Amino acid sequence: MIVYHKDFFVNRLVKEWLSHEKLIIACDLDDTIIPYNPELTDSCTETVQLIKDCQTEGITFIINTARQGSKLSSSVEQVEALGIKVHAINKMPSNWALPIGIAGKVYANIFLDDRGGLECTKHQLRKAFEIVKQFREQQLLQSL
């Protein structure tokens, strides 16, 4: 078994990212990528940059929020204005085959949410991104 990182969760993210050529990220909005509380503005900015970095290595990005109607529509526009490509909202992308047994739950390799250990998951995602990027750069150099 190949071990890319000593942390089980980082290692699992890297293996999934490399084996599927992409990673699925589900993300909350308020205080995760859109600041609601002013003291979390820097954290939101970091999260946005991390997602944009990950997009360079191939991700599917799903907004996973309780917002509805016009608040949701304006939020999606705000996220896209930040430079994040949104693939789906509160569901899997239409071109994605659902695994058996997820019963309507959004499937993702990682969930980013200010109420769900955001700093820890950001750290894990950042490490996984760095490893995947370095691995792919090494593969490219070896192929030359």
Regions found by a protein language model. Give the residues of each.
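HAD-like aspartate-dependent phosphatase fold
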Residues: 1-144
